[in-house]
Every structure is written in structure tokens, then in C-alpha cells.
Amino acid sequence: MSGSIAPSSPGLTLPVWVAAAAKAALQVLLDEPFNAEQQLNQGSDRPSLQVPVCSAAPLSDGQALGISRCDPGPGLDLTRDLEVWVRVAWIATPQPVLELQPGEGVGRLGPEGDICLSGFARELLERNLLPLLPAGRGLMVQPILPRGRSLAQRTSNAAFGVVDGLALIGTQAEVQRSAAPDQLQEVLAELEARAADPAFQGRLVLVIGENGLDLARQQGLGPVLKVGNWVGPVLVAAAEAGVRDLLLLGYHGKLIKLAGGIFHTHHHLADGRLEVLVALGLDAGLSTAELLQCRGAASVEEAFQALDPDQARALGQHLAAIVEQRSHSYLARYGAWSMRIGAALFDRSRTLRWWGPEAEKRFFTLRD
């Protein structure tokens, strides 16, 4: 079909599979024949998507169920082959509306909270379902991920307040490979464009993921560039592009890898987080018992929580300082640039906790 793309090459994010299953279920409610290839509208400036669905069937009392199976494309992804169920039901409303409810295995913002989904996910559902609703009817849409609760235990969702399952937080249809070379090229192209902008003043904030991006905006830090896991190459490229002051802003469980000299932060390539934390704890004067406690923790967050507040603060500040030092050392291996690198770390509640001396001097001097 002209103007459409199939899900085979880049892979599609979880919200796309939810929207496709929801549309198939709605078509059943409308007494239309089952369509195993759903066309999804992304908006006027994007090509439509052709997304396969497995099945759809009516249920009792004005309900229907659609099922798709997630294909995130090549690469390692825990959502591969994940069954996506979506239950839909009519609701009486004066105007066509969608009522989104989290089903089993779908993340909530807190135990009694709302469904955790991105603006992109909501817009994709609204764009493809609302035009099909008859007058005087709304639609309840309940995504269900039968394996979502168990898979969520292998993610950092809980670190950011998402409970009970996987969050539907894709920000675009195609899967972005944070460890893939293509993703690095996109970041480098964006960096080059930023640096070439006449308004660019030589300051840049690098974040790894969406949580860092949101926090940077909340804190008024910028301009911001999301780099995924390619921290090392982007550091060098930033120096080459003329960046003078660079801030690394990230979750402590990610940036701690830089303190250990690991500058590609994808967990499939290298880990060593707790080992690095123990080494830093030794520097900070923790006792043998405290070091063993850190080594046996399930996560960096848990290790910090087990320490008393003064110890945690001292260790966190030391961590931020070492991230700065190791980043400067990494950069010096590739050239003699004068770019200054600061580091700031946030915790599982997305609270900015610690920053190093360079970050203090260049980015946080005027803060409370």
C-alpha cells in the first residue's frame, strides 16, 4: 500500500500493538468483519501503519476483545512476542470519548493510580478509535498484558513509581534502538545541528532516557539532548562540536557505570553497577559490613536506602564526582579539548539528589 509502512524492519512500540488490537475489537462491536491487518493513522505528517493482529471476537453485554502480538523488531527486547489483549465496551456519553482503564499487567502510576501511558499512546488511540464511534456512544478501552506483571519486574518501572505492570510509554511508533549504530548516527546529527545553531551558547545537557528528559525540563536545564546509551561517543562528538559546558544528567543506576569506566550503558553490553558502588564505598570509608550490604543489594537504589542519610549523601556526592573525573579521562583519550563535564544524579523518585563539583560550578551555582 502506498504511503504505509509494515512493522517488519524497525519494529513497533507497545502502544502501536495496543491501538491495533483496540481497533480490531471496535470493528467487531460495529459488526464489521475481522480484519487481520489494521491500518493506523499517525497523523497528516506521518505514513500510516499496517499492523497485524491475531484475532478479535465479541463478548457479552456490548463488549469485544482484540489480540495482537508485539514485534519490537531486531535486537533484544523483553516485549518480543508479548500477547496484547484489549477489551472494549460501549459507554453512554453525549459525545464520543475514550475511557482508558489499566487491565492486568498494565502499569499504573501508584497502586490506585491512572493507567501509565504516554501522550503518543493516548493520541494514537484517540486518532484511530474516535472517528469510528457512533453518535451518543463512548468507548471503554482496557489494555491487558497477561505477562506484563512478571515482565515489569525485569524493568526499572518501579523505580519511577509505575506499579502492577508495563508502562505504555513509547513516544513514537518505531522502536528506537538505544544500543544500535543507527540511533547513534541520529543523535550525532542532532548534536551537529544544535551546535551549528546561531543561538547555541556552548552549554548542553545530555540525558539517557525519557525520565532524564522530563526532569531536565522540570528543572529548567537545557538545551537537552537525549543520547540513549551511547554516552562515550557523544561526549567526544560534543567536544568536537565546540560544546564548552556539558552536564550529564541521569538516574544513579545508569550513570554509576561511567564511574566504572563503562561508557556504553546498555545493560546487555556491560553491568558491574554494584561492584562499582562497593569500590566507591571503600573510597568513602564504609565499613566491611556496609560494603557487604551494598554488594548484596538488589539494586543501586536499595543499596543507598540501606545506608544512613549521611553515608548515602557522602557516597552519592563521591559517585557524582567520580563520574565527572572518569568522563574527563575518557575524553582525554581522544583529544585535548577544554570542554568541562559535570554530572548530576537523580533517584527512583526522580528527585535530583547529588551533583559533582563541576556541575555545581557550571550548572547549579545559583540554585537553592
Swiss-Prot record:
GO MF terms held by the record: cobalt-precorrin-5B C1-methyltransferase activity
Keywords: Cobalamin biosynthesis, Methyltransferase, S-adenosyl-L-methionine, Transferase
Keyword Lipid metabolism: no
Keyword Methyltransferase listed: yes
InterPro entries: CbiD (IPR002748), CbiD_sf (IPR036074)
Known catalytic reactions: Co-precorrin-5B + S-adenosyl-L-methionine = Co-precorrin-6A + S-adenosyl-L-homocysteine
Entry EC no(s): 2.1.1.195
Cystine bridges: none
Any one GO BP annotation for this protein: anaerobic cobalamin biosynthetic process
Coiled coil feature spans: none
Pathway annotation: Cofactor biosynthesis; adenosylcobalamin biosynthesis; cob(II)yrinate a,c-diamide from sirohydrochlorin (anaerobic route): step 6/10
Origin: domain of life: Bacteria
Family: Belongs to the CbiD family.
HAMAP family, A to Z: CbiD (MF_00787)
Name recorded for this polypeptide: Cobalt-precorrin-5B C(1)-methyltransferase
Organism: Synechococcus sp. (strain CC9605)
